[in-house]
Structure formats: C-alpha cells, structure tokens
Curated annotation (Swiss-Prot):
Keywords: Ribonucleoprotein, Ribosomal protein, RNA-binding, rRNA-binding
GO molecular function, one term: rRNA binding
Protein name per UniProt: Large ribosomal subunit protein uL22
HAMAP family found in the cross-reference section: Ribosomal_uL22_B
GO biological process: translation
Function according to Swiss-Prot or TrEMBL: This protein binds specifically to 23S rRNA; its binding is stimulated by other ribosomal proteins, e.g. L4, L17, and L20. It is important during the early stages of 50S assembly. It makes multiple contacts with different domains of the 23S rRNA in the assembled 50S subunit and ribosome.
InterPro entries in alphabetical order: Ribosomal_uL22, Ribosomal_uL22_bac/chlpt-type, Ribosomal_uL22_bac/org-type, Ribosomal_uL22_CS, Ribosomal_uL22_sf
Family membership noted in the UniProt record: Belongs to the universal ribosomal protein uL22 family.
Pfam families reported in the protein's UniProt record: Ribosomal_L22
CDD domains named in the record: Ribosomal_L22
Biased composition (Low complexity): 117-134
Annotated organism of origin: Campylobacter jejuni subsp. jejuni serotype O:2 (strain ATCC 700819 / NCTC 11168)
PROSITE patterns: RIBOSOMAL_L22
SUPFAM superfamilies in the record: Ribosomal protein L22
C-alpha cells in the first residue's frame, strides 16, 4: 500500500469530496481516465494524487485499486471586501488536503458456489364453509 498527500490545494473540500467518492474503490487506471473527462477543478488534483501514489509504490496503474481517497479541510484564507457605508464583508477562500491510498488489487479465485434449492410445500386449499343461517322473513300485518 502506498500513499500520496497533496496539501493546501486552493479548492473547497466539499466540492473535492464529491469527486473523491466517485473514484474510491476503482482501478487506478480507470479512475485516472474517468477523472480526465470530469469538468471539475478538483478532478485534476485528485488524478495527480492518484498517479503520485501509484509511482510512490512502484506499481503499474492497472494493477492497483484506489483504497481510499480522503479530502480534509485545511486553513481558510480570509479576505475583506469593502461594502456600503464604510463596512466590510468577509470573503472565505478555503483550502484542502487530499490523501490518496492505493493498494495492490487482490485476485479473486473463482470457486463454484453451490446454491441450496429451497424446498416448498404446497398447502391444500381451504375448504369453503356454507352458512347455516336461515333468512328471517317479516310478515306484514
């Protein structure tokens, strides 16, 4: 297992987490190919982190999977914008840390699985019961 950490990316962590969830558990080569066509700014940074983690471990991209992709909040740059009547409003410029862990893909052995057949018993249909009540007729007087 190898890791890559990219710190202080000028990107909102909430926006980067949307992309990080997409690639988690994917093959590294497939993840980098899908990130290449995403229009988001964070996709480029996460793709760089994945390729760096693959290189750190000395693996080939097609033989590893993205075990975890975590985006943490970093320091927030604070700026001020002048507003009316001498006041000012705060501008928050969030940054984030991206941590990617890749691991060697496990080869699954294909064993025959035996599935037990369910035994079903058929019930006899319920017998209809006939009503023994007699209709009462009112006599007109």
């Amino acid at each position: 297992m190898s890791k890559a950490l990219i710190k202080f990316i000028r990107l909102s962590p909430t926006k980067a987490r949307l992309i990080a969830r997409e690639v988690q558990g994917m093959n590294a080569e497939l993840a980098m190919a899908s990130l290449k066509f995403m229009p988001n700014k964070g996709a480029k940074y996460i793709a760089n982190a994945i390729s760096s983690a693959v290189a750190n471990g000395g693996f080939e991209a097609n033989e590893v999977i993205v075990k975890s992709c975590r985006v943490d909040a970093a320091a927030v740059l604070k700026r001020f914008r002048p507003r009316a009547r001498g006041s000012a409003s705060r501008i928050r410029k969030p940054t984030s840390h991206i941590l990617v862990e890749v691991a060697k893909a496990e080869v699954k052995s294909e064993e025959k699985k035996t599935v037990a057949k369910k035994t079903t018993t058929t019930k006899a249909p319920a017998k209809k019961t006939t009503s023994t009540k007699k209709a009462t007729v009112k006599k007109e007087s």
